Amino acid sequence: MAKQTGTRKKSSPDKSPPASPVRQKAAPETATPAPVSPLMGLPFEQPIVKLERQIQELIVLQEQKGVDYSHEIAKMRENLIGLIKKTYDNLSAWETVQVARHPNRPQTRDYIHMIIKDFEELHGDRRYGDDKAIVTGTGRIGSQKIMLIGQQKGRDTKEKIACNFGCAHPEGYRKALLKMQFAAKFGLPVVCLIDTPGAYPGLGSEERGVAEAIAVNLREMSVLPTPIICIVIGEGASGGALGIGVGDRLAMMQYAWYSVISPEGCSGILWKGSANAPDAAEALKLTSNHLRELGVIDDVIREPLGGAHRNPRAAADALERYIERSLRELKSVPIPQLLDQRYNKIRQYGVGALTAD
């Protein structure tokens, strides 16, 4: 049996991109988004990347030659904002999946650094080990103390391997449940950040009961006597997402996706290969707008122009505002009434799909 890690450890900004210790005001949506490296640009973003490169070249030329190109640069930036808006207003389901997987997209630890104060990380499930794919701990959003549960994919190669690319083992889900029960005991609301390609289906994971661990979480979260807010911040795939996805509010970031299976997995089953993943993405109705129309989710959290990967600070501010508002609403509801509402909410899943045109 693996050695159990310590139960409590101070959070440290080790792997995530550093966040400024001074809270910065988010850039307005009409401001020019931060340029994306050509190596990081998504296939459909290439016209945007090309225009960004031209703007940067003109800025360099202006500095080198001492010629005033400010009018031309301003005009190109205006065109850039229009191009980004047009592109992101017309994303296909498959393009949305690509945005959700962008390597620069904020992950759980990034949001912890940006919006959670006094975060104290809690480790281990007291049965097997400490799964790095799920981060748990206490902290504050505004003046409200919370229990944070979040899935972490990792940034660099070392962290990705440690986090198993966001694919949690059963000990990760048991760790999450243990911390949720701790939260309920001490009257702390639970905030779950979902971002996973799925629970890990390996031999060891199956031997240790990953399906049972997820099922127990579904059962226990359904009746946990404390407010629960669940937010899909990136990928929300299958039971791996459901394992921390039952609550009183279920929201999605604008360019996240949430589905019973990944587009590639669906394509492999229906078309015997991954080539039809774009068709599968459309059929799965996995985008935030589709799922809100179907009644699966409650809210969509708007992302900054060009997606969260272009302006993580603005995305974090939008997420923080949503959590604070939801906490105020849920904290005002007596626990027995809250549990009745949660039960009715769960019973309504799928009804929107039956009544949709």
Per-segment meaning from a language model:
Residues A2-K145, R313-D357:
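Intrinsically disordered, low-complexity segments enriched in small/flexible residues
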Residues A26, I194-E324, R328, S332:
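Conserved catalytic cores of soluble enzyme domains
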Residues L51, S92, L148, D195, ...:
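Terminal peptide-recognition signature
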Residues Y69-E72, G172-R174, C266:
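Short, motif-level signal for alpha-helix interfacial/capping segments enriched in acidic residues
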Residues K85, D89, D118, L122, ...:
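Glycine-rich beta-alpha loop segments
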Residues Q98, T138-R140, K145-I149, V191-L193, ...:
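Structured core elements
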Residues P106-T108, D156-K158, Y200-G202:
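Short active-site-adjacent helix-start/loop capping segments
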